[in-house]
């Protein structure tokens, strides 16, 4: 019995460490959050204006979009292999700092379908309280 309790304790510590470091273990990530079914359905049905939550690995950093509201942009790859553009409004939310290729980013925002896979935006609070607030999580920090 002591061995089982010890193993449970060690597993919990390891899980906490993995999450804190932003390390993604695909099977563990899917198990811990479910299947991201709203995002999968939106991708498959080419839907837009869908509030979604998920996680991906940064595959490419892009230059900021400075026309109109400024957006930090990067591409993430989901565990399914699908890629998405993240467009994070840095006029309304802090820039995601120390972001590198290979980093894991969790997101909650609005999905817009496009032929390249789609865009996640509204990853920030709405100062007018007319839209659901979103966020990005990276290396233990939340950006909203």
Regions found by a protein language model. Give the residues of each.
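OB-fold and OB-like single-stranded nucleic-acid-recognition modules
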Residues: 2-144
């Amino acid at each position: 019995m002591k061995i089982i309790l010890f193993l449970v304790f060690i597993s919990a510590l390891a899980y906490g460490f993995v999450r804190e470091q932003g390390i993604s273990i695909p099977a563990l990530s899917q198990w811990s959050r479910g299947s991201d079914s709203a995002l999968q359905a939106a991708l498959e049905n080419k839907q837009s204006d869908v509030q979604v939550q998920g996680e991906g690995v940064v595959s490419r950093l892009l230059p900021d979009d400075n026309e109109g509201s400024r957006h930090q942009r990067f591409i993430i790859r989901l565990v399914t292999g699908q890629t998405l553009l993240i467009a994070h409004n840095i006029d309304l939310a802090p820039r995601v700092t120390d972001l590198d290729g290979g980093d894991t980013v969790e997101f909650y925002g609005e999905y817009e379908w496009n032929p390249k896979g789609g865009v996640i935006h509204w990853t920030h609070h709405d100062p007018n309280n007319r839209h659901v607030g979103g966020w990005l999580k990276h290396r233990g920090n939340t950006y909203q």
